[in-house]
Amino acid sequence: MRKKAPPLAIAFLLIVAASTSYAAGKRITKLYVSNSEGDNITVIDLATYTVIGDIRVGEQVHGLCAPSDGRRLFTTIESENNLKVIDTTTDKVVETIPLTGRPNQCASTPDGRYVCVPIRNGNSVDIVDIAARKVVKVLPVALPHNCYDADNDDAMFVSSMGDQEINLIDLKKMAYAKKIPVGGIPRPYAVSKDGKRLYAALSDFHGFVIASIPDQKIVARVELPPAPPLACRLEPHTPTHGIELSPDGKELWVTSLADSGVYVYDIATNHLSTAIHVGKCPNWITFSPDGRYGAVSNSGSDDSSIIDTRTRREIARVKVGKGPKRLLAVTVP
């Protein structure tokens, strides 16, 4: 009598088969989720809402970023002070680049030439030349936390928690071009496609601020609806954390850790249009490149909510690793 394969073996074969299918040329969109209290990145197929892989990268995995071609994924590892390069076809680490200190959230230029990495314990930001495989410039910044790409190959943003501002870096000159005050300790933020508006979440504020980048000043302060007291272990002082513009640039999606929800704002009016319930303590938010799906990392329930952006409803909740933090959707060629 033929023996049945054990469940774990079947699961392993399914993952291998899926990976082989993707490597053979099927174009898919993968959601990568960094598990900050573990050593891994969970990989989810956004078309089926299923886990298709697990990438072991090192303890205290933090940042995720990628160039526009989707061929590589960059991740920062706090415990190792390095930046790792992942081939998105195989989901294997192919390169490790040393950094000058403990890294936080990274950002890549669209062409993948440079990666910006805040160095929290160095009060600085590393500019990494990926082709040269090394840090080529270190700029001073007080308590840096998040880098954000400027949607072009010549500029990058980095937030300063110490100076309560967000700085624009000119990558041609390798120097600061602008410093935009945000009126509080900046957490995640988003930048409009035309480069004129900046939307930032702040510590101890259940809402966000809007700043003019050309004028380098705050132009609006928007409070989210009232919510219960914040009780989230990973983000105890940030009731509003995840913040992202929809791919068409018309809406701002903001997570409320205090209310386990996602709030959608029309950026033309700054008016709330939709509230979506998700998992506990929603941390970060991202979109698939085509705007079809939104995804949220729920740090309080160790899962990720998948949202249909047309119906404005959560359509799946996928279990991931411990303490999910950053997440990024990448369409793999």
Give, region by region, the residue ranges found by the protein language model.
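Bacterial N-terminal signal peptides that target proteins for export
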Residues: 1-9
